[in-house]
Amino acid sequence: MAGPAHWAEARDLGAVGDGRFLNTAVLNRGILELSRSGGGTLHFSPGVYRTGTLWLKTGVTLYLESGATILGSTELADYPETPPPRPTGRLEFGRYALISAVGQQDVGIAGRGRIDGQGSNPNFSKKALIARGWSPVDAYLKRPYGLSFVQCRGVSVRDVTLADLGFWCEDYLDCENVSVQGVNVDSWKPDWNNDGIDVDGCRNVRVSNCSFRAGDDAICLKASYRDCEDVTVTNCTASSLANGIKLGTASNGGFRNIAISNVALDGVQESGITIEIVDGGTLDGVTVQNIAMRNVTAAVFIRLGDMARSWTTGAGRPGIGVLRNVSISDIVAELSPRGNLSTGGSITGLPGHPVENVSISNVRMALRGAFPRGARIDPRSVPEAGANYPEHSMFGPLPAYGLFVRHVRGLALHNVVFSGGGGDGRPAVILDDAGRVDVDGLRPDSMVVLP
């Protein structure tokens, strides 16, 4: 079926691009034959190819020409369950997916075409499924991901558009040598759980020149059961119904050598930059620089918590983790707070478990406060909330309009400027149980240090 160059045309295999014919069997047979012949490219000429789950195999790339669409079926029965990877547990992966690869090597998706999950169909709505009698857990888990790569080596996704997916848009779990380049994700849904991209416990990953419109976290790194390390994210744009750039929450593993740069965020309902360890892992060595934010609720949220979830079977309850060595620089943020949550950001650890060595430099935050003029909040009234799910809004209104810092050892604030705040009576910065603090160029210089 494939010529000497191992190139196969989907239509030549019997695929029909009319948007009605179900191509699942034809396309999976072609993928399998290509892989068995040593690998190659399955080419999609312009047309709309309706399908259920496609199982991507070693050595195979799907190439979608401009005008070609892989259209996900709206029938849940067309998405068989993917066997869980090892280690087993409550891992987040594509149990059901439009395109799935498990334990494969040198796989890819490319071209200027489109992958459309038809996620707006009621069959993919949690609310609609629960109304039909589904349990909340099944309504959450049994919707199909867009792309799901599990324990793969050598993954390339480039130039395609991922639109209207039923669940997470693209997920990479325990993969190595991953390149995601020039991908446009457009899945802005109010049903939540439409993350733009999730990179969980992967090594050597580069995400570049991508755009994300996501109904949940836009760019999300996780470490459910192993470290996420050697990851770069650069030259991307994002909007989100949740967080813009996020590390966490799943974190039995940790984060090492993570570099995020040159990202423009416009329209983020939670925090622009969110960095979390709440499941016992270690975050050590994260750099975030050159980030522009507009219409973002909060700029920075750094949290060491104690949700203490175990993501693998038999792992036991994890202890409190470690969050240290974070550098955030060259940030311009125009904040549009929701309700009375008018604060630029927060950095919080737990008693006896501080966040360590955070540097924030060359930052400009313009705040438009909705806080009552002249109002103040007692800093001692802010709850610890160690076991709560971490979001910038978890503490309620904060006593500082710029930055609230608690349980931190090693903090550098250099050339940090807040504008538009201060009329509500709160100071710009509050330090509570903070040691080894170096402040230079803070404006306005209204900082309260609690004993």
Q: Model-derived features: where do they sit?
A:
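Extracellular/periplasmic carbohydrate-active domains that bind, remodel
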Residues: M1-P451
